[in-house]
Amino acid sequence: MVDDKEKNMKCLTFFLMLPETVKNRSKKSSKKANTGSSSSNSSKLPPVCYEIITLKTKKKKMAADIFPRKKPANSSSTSVQQYHQQNLSNNNLIPAPNWQGLYPTIRERNAVMFNNDLMADVHFVVGPPGGTQRLPGHKYVLAVGSSVFHAMFYGELAEDKDEIRIPDVEPAAFLAMLKYIYCDEIDLAADTVLATLYAAKKYIVPHLARACVNFLETSLSAKNACVLLSQSCLFEEPDLTQRCWEVIDAQAELALKSEGFCDIDFQTLESILRRETLNAKEIVVFEAALNWAEVECQRQDLALSIENKRKVLGKALYLIRIPTMALDDFANGAAQSGVLTLNETNDIFLWYTAAKKPELQFVSKARKGLVPQRCHRFQSCAYRSNQWRYRGRCDSIQFAVDKRVFIAGFGLYGSSCGSAEYSAKIELKRQGVVLGQNLSKYFSDGSSNTFPVWFEYPVQIEPDTFYTASVILDGNELSYFGQEGMTEVQCGKVTVQFQCSSDSTNGTGVQGGQIPELIFYA
């Protein structure tokens, strides 16, 4: 009895994902089947391999809205045109006698059949109304590549139509999936990768789905992390979700100020506002929430009023830790935004100033943020009467990591002759391209300790690639310098390798010199 129930559930799951024509036909056949015995009914259930992974019905955001465009705006249609040209080329090859002999492997011969009308026994009308493409297919090849296609063409509820409509998949994404099934090639583009992931999930092509996720992880940045977080939850990809959180936590202010933040759904907004480890000032969180509310009003066709902004924010407003803002930020920002009621504004002012603090609906405990890690590359430091001097020359070192990290700043030495102030220009480059830089001052107390100098925003560092860390210091006093430098340092779970940089003109290298510490989040 339990087995029958399980089979029925699998059958129902499969049935819900079938095209309407199959559903209607199966309903008619089920009426006929009711006249038979129960054992006969159970024998007609599809086998276990027909179980379908259903996708959530919430609308997925297209990758073209997430990634910076590297192609023209019509690159999706361009992809379809390229596939169409390949279709014409394939068809032109067929009249040649013994064309099979031109290709030594089964993979190459199968590739000729990709997007080819020769021997096609099914056609797909793919895409929403007004944007459809009619694509040829070969049932045997498709069934070998996907258990869903196997069920559609060879299962108990097999589709017997010559033409199948698929309105919920983009043509370019469907073609990318077919190319993988026919040619064993993965051809992904930034503007179609999410749609391809949707197709791979729908038709259970797991290796292609994994490749899509890897593509998204590689392309992940503060600009698209919030939107990808929302999408990764919809696609049920926990590894991608975790990667998104790592970026959002470490580069919170950049992520919150990105255009993509305004495109997230309400549930994702709540998750971000609730996040304990956001590395951001609370006034930035507040302003980001208001920006999201403005766009949400437009999505809901509401007037852009203070009342409507508060309405769409709802209870999420109380996830913003307004009482933890600097008093100036609150007085000049949140208090004058109009979003807070007069009572809320008064109570928060009392929270800042009164000995007896009022009860607030807002969270009053500051976020923990992330704890920075320090990678120290020298085993000792020293000073001599004739070193180390700064004359506006560059101290530089190259480094690489084995895991993605976010460089927040450098730890620098100070004066070896008592207290002194230094002006420091720090810079981080990859293959000559500046990724981050900052000009600031720091005060040293005469000790051999290192003193942190920060970038404006943490810089994302990818694994297995060398980056160049540079600093130009301006100070009159002699400085401490590092000795017994290490080429490889283990910092927690991150391994950092160092090598000399050609940019260094003041004597710094692997064995000794300046830039003793990298400060990072991991």
UniProtKB/Swiss-Prot annotation:
All copies of the BTB domain together span 120-190
Locate the transmembrane regions by residue number: none
GO CC aspect terms: cytosol; nucleus
Span of domain BACK: 235-300
**Which subcellular locations apply to this protein?**
Cytoplasm, Cytosol; Nucleus
Tell me the tissue specificity.
Strongly expressed in the primary visual cortex.
The record's principal subcellular location, in a coarse class, is cytoplasm
Tell me the superkingdom of the source: Eukaryota
| Keyword Nucleus among record annotations | yes
Q: Which GO terms describe its biological process?
A: cerebral cortex development; dendrite morphogenesis
Q: Which UniProt keywords apply?
A: Cytoplasm, Neurogenesis, Nucleus
Ribosomal protein keyword on record? no
Functionally, this protein is described as follows:
Acts as a key regulator of dendritic field orientation during development of sensory cortex. Also directs dendrites toward active axon terminals when ectopically expressed.
- Which PANTHER family does the protein's record reference? BTB/POZ DOMAIN-CONTAINING (PTHR45774), BTB_POZ DOMAIN-CONTAINING PROTEIN 3 (PTHR45774:SF2)
- What name goes with this protein? BTB/POZ domain-containing protein 3
Q: Can you name the source organism? A: Callithrix jacchus
- Name the gene for this chain: BTBD3
